[in-house]
A protein has these predicted regions:
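Short loop/turn motifs at secondary-structure junctions and domain boundaries
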Residues: 52-57, 136
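A generic secondary-structure signal
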Residues: 51-52, 106
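Acyl-donor (CoA/ACP) binding surface of acyl/acetyltransferases
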Residues: 1-32, 61-175
Length: 175
């Protein structure tokens, strides 16, 4: 499976993505807002990548390629919850928004799902802006929803309905 945007390719993960994905998941800057601490070993990332690959077509989850280099992931590890992470070297270019928009458009075009969801740390202002720019609406707050490396994190919950997504441009980079 492959989705192309103006700058990116979102595709199914492969075993040879291991080192590139490890570069993302082992970087403390990238995982600051992630649901687990940075990966310490390549084996830890291998287990994560194998689970991503085993998820199959019912859970469209993609690695993100920029100019032939894997720089992150975006998609739906658990339907209907969207998740995304990028290597810090490519932050600030609108790539996360472009990738998430493409993944969202794909799911609404190919799945019988009415609402997509997201869970974001209230301190992650960039991710909150991204979700809101894509039309996600805050639906709630949860205290101590994630235990990441022994530290409890809160969550803002977001949702995007199919009805609100109709008519939005597909896979365009944000302005």
């Amino acid at each position: 499976m492959e989705i192309r945007t103006p700058r990116l390719i979102l595709r199914t993960a492969r075993p040879d993505d291991l080192e590139a994905i490890h570069a993302v998941l082992s970087d403390p800057r990238a995982t600051r807002w992630w649901s687990s601490p940075p990966h310490d070993t390549l084996e830890q990332t291998r287990v994560w990548l194998e689970a991503m690959m085993a998820n199959g077509p019912d859970h469209p989850d993609f690695v993100i390629e920029l100019d032939g280099r894997v720089v992150g992931k975006a998609g739906f590890y658990e339907m209907p919850d969207v998740g995304y992470i990028l290597h810090p070297d490519v932050w600030g270019q609108g790539l996360a928004g472009e990738a998430v928009r493409a993944a969202v458009d794909h799911v609404f075009a190919t799945r019988d799902v009415d609402t997509l969801k997201a869970d974001v740390d209230p301190e992650n202002a960039a991710s909150i802006r991204l979700l809101e720019r894509l039309g996600f609406v805050r639906t709630g707050f949860g205290e101590r929803t994630w235990n990441v490396g022994g530290v409890w994190k809160d969550s803002f919950f977001y949702a995007l309905s199919r009805r609100d997504q109709v008519g939005k441009a597909s896979a365009e980079p944000p302005a």
